[in-house]
Amino acid sequence: SLHDALPISGLYIHVPFCAKRCLYCDFFSNTEMKYKEPYINALIKEMELRKGYIGNEALETIYFGGGTPSQLDEKDFGKIFEAIYRHFDVAEQAEITLEANPDDMKREYVSLLRNYPFNRVSMGVQSFHPEDLRFLNRRHDREQAIKAVELCKEYGITNISIDLIYGLPNQTQQADRKSTRLNSSHHR
């Protein structure tokens, strides 16, 4: 029945807000930040309503996806994490991921993330090539993407994944290989 505990150990939090829509994205998102606070309040209410669905399972993963979760600020994270820890048991070694756009990951923002239990960042780089980034309607450039990865590492977030899109119009295999080499050079 619906009231029986479900044996799950992960929590996905969809953050449907973006500063700008990307050409390729089919996920629900909104550029109207005026809806952010009501959405977060509804999200917290949803956690309260569903807290019993997990039973005694501790959350092993918490994933903030989107949209663009890096559009959230300190107040937003504070409210959401308070609700998570109030309503759910979180495993001590839980993987807690933030999807982020490279241009949001400035020093002040990455430093702020240390106040929360994030231990993984999934960076929406998509490409290191200016033509591809323009085509995809992305806000960042190659240098911002590289700097964002470096800042995460500097602030102790070393579990970083990078999304890259292949097969775009006019994209060459040579460009794909170059992106892969650049991505690989940041693994240490």
Regions found by a protein language model. Give the residues of each.
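Short, small-residue-biased leader/transition segments that mark boundaries at the very start
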Residues: 2-6, 182-186
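ATP/adenylate-binding site constellation spanning eukaryotic-like Ser/Thr protein kinases
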Residues: 3, 15, 77
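Structural signature of beta-strand start/N-cap positions in the alpha/beta core
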Residues: 9-10, 58-60
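Glycine-centered loop/turn positions within well-structured domains
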Residues: 20, 130-131, 187-188
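Generic hydrophobic alpha-helical segments
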Residues: 25, 50, 187-188
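Conserved non-cysteine loop/helix-boundary elements of the Radical SAM core domain that shape
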Residues: 29-53, 59-183
